[in-house]
């Protein structure tokens, strides 16, 4: 059982990663293997809309990890896509990554019927709009959406602030438990 967690932040160890680390603890306690994909530190190109991927199953842009992610996604059991909030939407980096990963995934077969969870981290507001943006990818790819005991969000400007958001951290733990449960149920048939 494996979940892939995508950190859509430019900061490898910022507030978004703080939220994911809280989830990872729960996944490990639930005996779910984790793999973190860090989008920070490298450029992510936007989709060229050339449609070559619809014939080849791969994006023509080969140097930013999207094709590698799609290959790994085919064997994953669930996904978490996490983002910092910029002006009430996910990071452009994450949007570019999702556009290309979902479109080039050959009819979305890498994601179909696999549960997904969106996570948004912000200093203050805009999280629900950001979550809506990510959840749209799940809907079009026929992915069940995992929820928690509150919206999947954490508040804080820096990692230590985010870790002090008790309700946000509890929401992340509950979200991880719910996603692990969904993956196990689907695997059991």
Predicted segment positions?
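Glycine-rich phosphate/pyrophosphate-binding loop and the adjoining helix
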Residues: 4, 24, 28-30, 62-68, ...
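N-terminal beta-loop-helix "entrance" segment that forms/cooperates
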Residues: 39-58, 157-162
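N-terminal beta1-alpha1 ligand-phosphate binding loop
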Residues: 2-32
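A structural preference for short, hydrophobic beta-strand core positions in alpha/beta folds
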Residues: 35-38, 147
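Helix-loop-strand module that forms the ligand-binding subsite of alpha/beta enzymes
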Residues: 58-150
């Amino acid at each position: 059982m494996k979940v892939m967690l995508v950190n859509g932040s430019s900061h490898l160890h910022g507030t978004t990663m703080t939220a994911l680390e809280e989830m990872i603890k729960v996944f490990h306690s639930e005996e779910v293997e984790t793999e973190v994909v860090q989008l920070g530190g490298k450029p992510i190109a936007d989709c060229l809309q050339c449609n070559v991927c619809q014939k080849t199953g791969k994006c023509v842009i080969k140097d930013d990890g999207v094709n590698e992610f799609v290959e790994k996604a085919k064997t994953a059991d669930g996904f978490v896509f996490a983002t910092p909030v910029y002006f009430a939407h996910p990071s452009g980096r994450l949007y570019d990554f999702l556009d290309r990963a979902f479109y080039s995934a050959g009819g979305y077969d890498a994601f179909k019927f696999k549960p997904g969870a969106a996570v948004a981290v912000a200093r203050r507001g805009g999280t629900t709009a950001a979550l809506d943006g990510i959840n749209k990818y799940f809907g079009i790819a026929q992915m069940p959406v995992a929820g928690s005991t509150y919206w999947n969000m954490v508040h804080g400007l820096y990692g230590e602030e985010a870790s002090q958001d008790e309700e946000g951290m509890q929401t992340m733990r509950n979200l991880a438990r719910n996603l692990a449960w969904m993956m196990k149920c689907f695997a059991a048939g």
